[in-house]
Every structure is written in C-alpha cells, then in structure tokens.
Amino acid sequence: EHAQAKRFTLEAYPLVALLEGARVTMQPGASDLHYDVSLTYADGRKIEERVYAPNQLGHAQDGTPELSPTGWLRVRDAEGVPQIDAAQATEFQQVFRSIVDTVRGHAWGAHEPYFDRLEIRVDLPGIDFALPVDEEIVSTFEALHEDVYFSLLEHFQQHSGRPSGDRGLQPGQIIPDIRRHDGAARVLISLEPFAALAPVAPAALETPLAQMREPLSAAQIAGCMAAFGGDTFQAVSRQGRPVLGTYLRGPGPAVFISGAQHANETSGVVGALRAAQALAARGDAHFALIAAENPDGYALFNRLREHHPRHMLHASRYSALGDDIAYRERAPFFEREGRHQAHAISGAQLHINLHGYPAHEWTRPLSGYLPRHFELWTIPKGFFLVLRHHPGWGERARRLIEGVTARLARNVPGLVEFNARQLELFHAHALETGFDVLNGIPVQVTESDREALPLALISEFPDETVYGDRFVFAHTVQMETVLAATDLHRNAGV
C-alpha cells in the first residue's frame, strides 16, 4: 500500500526482454511482499513459486512513506524453526544513512548557497555489470550516487523552505564520488572551495563531428564555436568558465539552438554543433547558438565519468550553484545570462533545446526505488519531443510538431524502429503509453508561459551515457531535429 503504482512491474524491468520468446504477463498481487510466479512450459508442465521481496517501510524527510528494498536475515534452527527473520541493514544501506544523517545534522545557515562544493567520497564493494539488453547496466555504485545526490537535494529543499522537487534551489554543488573498493566501506564528507581554473584553449577536432563516438571536451567545444565566426557573445559560469555563444546573421526568422542545459546530456552538444555547421554551409543561416550552456556541470561530468563512463551521473546535471539554470530566479544569472543575450541579439521566437535522459534504468533503491518526481523517466522510451508554447501559439505548435516528426521519421534511418523497440518494453513494464505517438515519435505538447520564447522544442534522446554507434545515432537525431525545426519555422511560418 505504501509503494507507488506500478512500482513492482517497473522494478522487474527488463525482465520481458531477458525472457525474449516467452509470453510474460504481470498482474497486481497481494500486499504481503511476495512475487507469485506461475511458469508454464511448452511441454505442459506448470510450476508455481513464491519469491520474497525484502522491503522495509521508511519515510522521506518530508514524511512521505517509502517502501524500499533492504537486506534480510533469515536463520532457522536444526528443526527448521525460524530463529531470526527480520530486516538487516547492509553495509550499502549503512553508508547511505550515515551520509544523509551527517548532512541533516549539520548547521547549514539560513541563506543559499550553503557551500561551494559538498564533496562526498565513498569507497565500497559493489556490483556493476552490463545486461544483454540494449544499454542496460546494473550498478550499486550508480544507485548510491543517484540516491545520495537526490536525497541531499530534498534535504536542502526542505531546509530552505522550498517545495520538494524545486529546481530553483541553490545549495551549492553536491558531488557524490562513488568508487569501487574491495575492503571495508569508507566515507569522507568535506566542504571545499571552488578550485582555481586553468584557461581552456580551443582545440581542433581530429575526427569530424559526424563521426564523434564520445562526448566532446570543453576545448573541442570551444574550437568548434570559434570556427563559426559570427557575432560572438559570452556569459560566465558560477565557477568562472565561459558560456560561449555566437550569432550568425541572415535572412528570415532566427532560431535559438542550445545544448547541455543539463550537462550530463551530451549528445545535444554534438547535435547542435553539427546542425549549426550544416546551416552555416547553406549561406543563409540565421541563428544564435550556445552549444554547452552549463560548463561547470560539464566539467564535473567529465571528471566523474573517468571512473564510471556509462553511468548517468546526475550530480553533473545542474549548475555549480546546484540549480537548473533554466529555473534560475534572480541575479546574478551567470550561465542564464547567455540565454538572455541570445534572445536579445537574435529576436528568435523558437528555442530548440537539445536534451537527453537515462539510457538505462534509473533507480533510487534506498528511497522507495523509483526516482521521486521523475517516475516517468525511470526506464527508456525512445527518442521523443516536448513542445511548449505560449497562449495563442497552439496552431503553430501543432504544425511544427507534425512537420518535425514526419521529417525525422523520413530522414533518420532506424529511428522509428528504435522507438518501437524501446516503447514496446516501456509499455510492458510501465503498463501505460506515457505520451502520444506521432509518426513513430512520442510527443508531448503543452501550453505554458514559463518559457521565455513563444515556442520551445525540447528533444529527449536516451543518451546517459552512451558511446560508439549509439552516440553517433543520438547526435544525428539531435542534428536532424534542429534542421527540421529550423526549416519549418523559416519556410512554413511556424
């Protein structure tokens, strides 16, 4: 009763894919924390099993009940009579609780931000392996990173008097650095100042953007941005890194193209640069471009992926202030000032904002399993588009989303099939569609005045964190999204 709806069908992901060739049916069961498993074989045999799912009821900081997986110790005597049958805190759970309790017990003061960097170094044994299903991995190291990061965000949201999930919170930069270690677990929590920065010199690419098989470095991004020329503009991040922008003047309406608002979503950076190169090569380009909006988060992402290259690394998602730059509420605006300049210099009415999301299952097993406020993002569901429009722009938004999805389905080989595979598995475990599907691409269109420009097209590719052919495919889809939206906006008046 304290588990979220569909919690256990989602927890079973990706069982349906692992049992390829078998028909799998999942139905709600009793509330006694057992899976009832019925196996029917081709030869007519039937086997019934009950599998215990050890869970323990706890509460989030705001009092929300959380039914979370736990260790369990069951001891029977020589006659088979249970002597111990109870939850047993594992080392993994004890590490998590020690971190959260230490942070909760500290006197943080009354004003944001509360620190520059909150470094949480953890060394412990664990599990980390790939599954034979798409980009899926199973990792206790990743799970701990995610649960520590978001649990501490929730603590500081409550400490500051903000609602749970508030993205404007500026606690400072929270950095869970989780490492594999075969001995006893170790935890070191420290408050650190921001480090002095070395200048980043623009670097030329040794591989064409179209063939990039991993995220770009900051130097490579700077080199690509410098090559455009145009009217350059710049903001400065909280840690002092440049937020590089350029404006290419041309005929017709302008668009604003951006990537890496969330810095662990890296396919959009390459996609934005590739699209800008293609538009510039036509000779009539008219756009403002910020390929990497969040350079502090991007630097942290590159630091953390040295140890866990395939993890989603959500601690690098937000800025060094700890907020989502798109939700920044007041000056100094730092990175967001780049958007303000892009809007002013270009007069754009369409923002093409390239994003990503986890390429494999996202869990918080120490806090109720499903990621709070992000439950619909817990498993991949293909490439999809979110379109937000101001009041009065609904018809133009409809034409834009119809045109972009049709062109993507036509111009990107394998995209519709890729989406169909991921959506089929999503439906099997989420027991819902999640989004409308248009031309084989999930879409969500909403009226909102939160976006600065009248039209905001947000792309979402499951790219956290992929490499090789999948990364090339990801940034190709991102590029084609920009090209399709730009052409439709310029030529069809949407």
Model-inferred region functions:
Residues Q261-T266:
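Short acidic, Gly/Ser-rich segments with clustered Asp/Glu that frequently serve as metal-coordination loops
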Residues E1-M212, F334, A344-S346, P365-V494:
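C-terminal accessory segments enriched in acidic
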Residues A272-A276, Q478:
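Amphipathic alpha-helical scaffolding segments
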Residues G240-R241, R303-H308, I441-T446:
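Alpha-helical scaffolding within the catalytic cores
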Residues F256-A260:
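Short hydrophobic beta-strand that contains or immediately precedes a catalytic carboxylate
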Residues P199-P253:
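Soluble metallo-hydrolase cores and metallopeptidase-like ectodomains found primarily
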Residues G252-P253, S267-V270, A281-E395:
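Active-site/substrate-binding loop(s) of hydrolase catalytic cores
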